[in-house]
A protein has these predicted regions:
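Short linear sequence motif anchored by a di-proline
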Residues: 1-229
Length: 229
C-alpha cells in the first residue's frame, strides 16, 4: 500500500518537471509527511497542464456524508469495484512524489519506517484515480493511489507498492484507454529505486519537516540504506 507521501521539490522545478502550473488554492508548500486525509497535489487527465490539490481518500459516490475515503486501490481489481469503476474508466491522474514511506515489522517486532525514493529524479509520478464527491452542502475533489505487486526492493519491506510510472509513460497514462492503463500498472524497476530506514518521527503526521527524511544511524538501525542494484 501507500499510506504516506512527500513532495518537497521547489515549485518552479515541479512545474518544469511536469510541464504544468500550480493552480491550487493556497498555492504550493513543500510537504515532508503527507498523511491520508491531507491534500495531495495531482495532475488530472482533464487538465494535464495544471497541478491542483485533491483530498487524499476517494469518497464513495454513494456516501451521505464526507469521510476520509479510500487511500489506495489495487490496480489489478480496481475496474471490478463499484467504488472505483467510474474513476478507472475515465479519471486517471498523476500524483507527484519526492518519495513515499512504508513500514516493515521484522519478526512481528516494532514497525520500522522506510523512505523509498528515486535518487535520479527529485519528483516522480505515482498513478492515481480521481473523483469529485458531491454532498448537500459541499463538493470534495478526491484521489486514491493505485498499488501493485512489490518489486524485489519493496518485497523486503511490504507486500504492496504504489504504481510508479516511468517518466515517458506519464502522458500516456493520462490519455490511454482503461485496458492500456492496466498494462502500465507494473512494479517499477527496482534498480531505479532506493530505500533507507528513517526514524519513527514520520509516524506522527504533525512532524512535517526535513528531519523526517534523515536516515537512521546505520550502527543503530542495522539495515541502513540499500538498493536492489
Amino acid at each position: 500500500m501507500c499510506g504516506r507521501n512527500s513532495l518537497f521539490i521547489e515549485q518552479a522545478d515541479l512545474e518544469t518537471r511536469f510541464d504544468a502550473e500550480v493552480v491550487a488554492d493556497g498555492g504550493y508548500t513543500s510537504r515532508y509527511n503527507i498523511a491520508p486525509g491531507d491534500d495531495l497535489h495531482i495532475i488530472t487527465n482533464e487538465t494535464p497542464d495544471e497541478i491542483d490539490r485533491y483530498h487524499w481518500g476517494l469518497i464513495p459516490f454513494w456516501a451521505d456524508e464526507s469521510e476520509e475515503g479510500i487511500i489506495n486501490a489495487r490496480s489489478e481489481t480496481a475496474d471490478e469495484k463499484r467504488v472505483f469503476e467510474q474513476a478507472w474508466e475515465s479519471r486517471p491522474c498523476l500524483v507527484p512524489s519526492s518519495g513515499f514511506y512504508e513500514w516493515k515489522a521484522p519478526n512481528g517486532g516494532p514497525k520500522q519506517p522506510y523512505r523509498i525514493y528515486r535518487e535520479d529524479d527529485p519528483a516522480f509520478a505515482m498513478a492515481g484515480l480521481w473523483d469529485v464527491w458531491e454532498g448537500d452542502d459541499e463538493t470534495i475533489p478526491c484521489v486514491t493511489i493505485l498499488t501493485t505487486e512489490p518489486n524485489d526492493l519493496m518485497n523486503s519491506i511490504h507486500d504492496r507498492m504504489p504504481v510508479v510510472l516511468p517518466q515517458d509513460a506519464e502522458s500516456g497514462w493520462l490519455a490511454a484507454d482503461p485496458d492500456t492503463r492496466k498494462d502500465l500498472c507494473q512494479p517499477y524497476p527496482e534498480d531505479d529505486l532506493n530505500a533507507y530506514e528513517i526514524s519513527t518521527q514520520v509516524n506522527n503526521p504533525g512532524n512535517d519537516d526535513p528531519r523526517v527524511i534523515e536516515p537512521l544511524d546505520h550502527e543503530q538501525s542495522g539495515l541502513g540504506e540499500f538498493s536492489s542494484g
